[in-house]
Amino acid sequence: MNISSPAMYTEKEASSKRYKYAACIILILIIITYSLFILKKDALHVDEVLSFVISTYNSYGFKKNFNEGIIYTSSALKNDMFGYDNSIHDILDDIISLRKNNRDSPHTNFYYSLLRVSFIGSHFSGIDTIMLRAGILNICISIITFIFLYRLSLIIFTTDIARITCLILAFFSPAAISTVLFYRPYQLQTLFFYYQYFFILHNNK
């Protein structure tokens, strides 16, 4: 059969549609799975605490110590460490401060700035508030990551089975789920890796 014949073109087009439908189903399952895990999360790792303290540019919990002569309530401790003002002016001030010095030299300020923006429209009423916002942010980053890997799989693999397997392994592995649940810049790092890889291959294919 001639590879340019209508029959071959129709077969290839049908295969592409199957992959698109499968990818949509996988993405929906990813969002549901990640959301369920995030809703079940009830504690923070010490590094995650650092993410929130840095993003809101608070001093307590970072360089400023609590007064040893004062007995604090748990609510007061949480408010001093995680409290924030949700006004646009204060958010911009924090982002500018993060740009000048994010106080975490191994990482850029980008994730912390996104985390700060994610608090728009909310008031600190407990750790659950910021955990939920951070979880939604990581899910949004995962969706963008999924789009780039979807496009990347079209370049790397030639069969739908290989592409679907790639998406499943990349987003349903224990490591992938753990990264989404860990509120640090690593999910954003994964996104940039796929973006860079896609950009290189897309421009050299």
Predicted regions and their residues:
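Membrane-interfacial, low-structure loops and terminal tails that flank and connect transmembrane helices
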Residues: 1-16
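Transmembrane signal-anchor helices characteristic of membrane glycosylation enzymes that use polyprenol
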Residues: 18-86
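Interfacial juxtamembrane loops and adjacent helix segments
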Residues: 56-107, 115-131
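Transmembrane alpha-helices of multi-pass, membrane-embedded glycan-processing enzymes
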Residues: 102-107, 111, 115-122, 134-148, ...
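Specific aromatic-rich, kink-prone transmembrane helix
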Residues: 117, 148, 168, 172, ...
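Hydrophobic alpha-helical transmembrane segments
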Residues: 21-25, 113, 136, 164-168
